[in-house]
Amino acid sequence: MSKSRLTVFSFVRRFLLRLMVVLAVFWGGGIALFSVAPVPFSAVMAERQVSAWLHGNFRYVAHSDWVSMDQISPWMGLAVIAAEDQKFPEHWGFDVASIEQALAHNERNENRIRGASTISQQTAKNLFLWDGRSWVRKGLEAGLTLGIETVWSKKRILTVYLNIAEFGDGVFGVEAAAQRYFHKPASKLTRSEAALLAAVLPNPLRFKVSAPSGYVRGRQAWILRQMYQLGGESFMQQHQLD
């Protein structure tokens, strides 16, 4: 290998190492800070805002209204757990059984990809990472998930998740969603309303809370049944999530 190539390789290696250190400090600081402080914005919110500006939409504003867990109806937390991650109180960020099932399903159905991200993984991704699918992003997501699972309580993870989740175009967080769709604060959401909000989470830009399709209504009904089977509000109390 020539001297010039060695110089370039050495420069790239040093740059990547420094970048990794900077990102580790940035993300580590974010995990520590947001373990106690309200989250003002997320990576997904920033991505949506920049995308809107690039497309000439300067009226678009991505924001969320932070609320603590005692300002959120217990039905809402239960609804997203029932819909997205029923083993949330038990695992350390990853549901291995669901991952194995998703991999097996995706091998058989390449055109219908199934995910297996837990609430913890979704929180890490939405808060710190860009949208999309790649092994690099998945690797970073895994590290960030371990970080928040180590530093944050389950209640804190759920609180942050509910405050940064996307419920529609420009609608981030359960407080903004409750006000937009039901004209009430998140603390007043009913069991049915919470299930409807949770029903659009797989794809909130495609599925509409304001005009729910038959699929969304069916998913809402399924979530309501799962909420009942989990034990209702007592589930949240039992796992100290309320």
Swiss-Prot record:
Keyword terms, alphabetized: Cell inner membrane, Cell membrane, Cell shape, Cell wall biogenesis/degradation, Glycosyltransferase, Membrane, Peptidoglycan synthesis, Transferase, Transmembrane, Transmembrane helix
Q: Where in the cell is it found?
A: Cell inner membrane
- Record-linked NCBIfam families: mono_pep_trsgly (TIGR02070)
Q: Write out the catalysed reaction.
A: [GlcNAc-(1->4)-Mur2Ac(oyl-L-Ala-gamma-D-Glu-L-Lys-D-Ala-D-Ala)](n)-di-trans,octa-cis-undecaprenyl diphosphate + beta-D-GlcNAc-(1->4)-Mur2Ac(oyl-L-Ala-gamma-D-Glu-L-Lys-D-Ala-D-Ala)-di-trans,octa-cis-undecaprenyl diphosphate = [GlcNAc-(1->4)-Mur2Ac(oyl-L-Ala-gamma-D-Glu-L-Lys-D-Ala-D-Ala)](n+1)-di-trans,octa-cis-undecaprenyl diphosphate + di-trans,octa-cis-undecaprenyl diphosphate + H(+)
Briefly, what is this protein's role?
Peptidoglycan polymerase that catalyzes glycan chain elongation from lipid-linked precursors.
Lineage, top-rank taxon, reads: Bacteria
* Broad enzyme group: transferase
GO BP annotations listed: cell wall organization; peptidoglycan biosynthetic process; regulation of cell shape
Quote the pathway field: Cell wall biogenesis; peptidoglycan biosynthesis
Q: How does it sit in the membrane?
A: Single-pass membrane protein
Q: Where do transmembrane segments lie in this chain?
A: 19-39
In the UniProt record, which is one GO cellular component term? peptidoglycan-based cell wall
Family, similarity comment: Belongs to the glycosyltransferase 51 family.
> What is the protein's major site of localization?
membrane
Q: Per its record, what are the GO molecular function terms?
A: pentosyltransferase activity; peptidoglycan glycosyltransferase activity
Spell out the protein name for this chain.
Answer: Biosynthetic peptidoglycan transglycosylase
Enzyme Commission identifier(s): 2.4.99.28
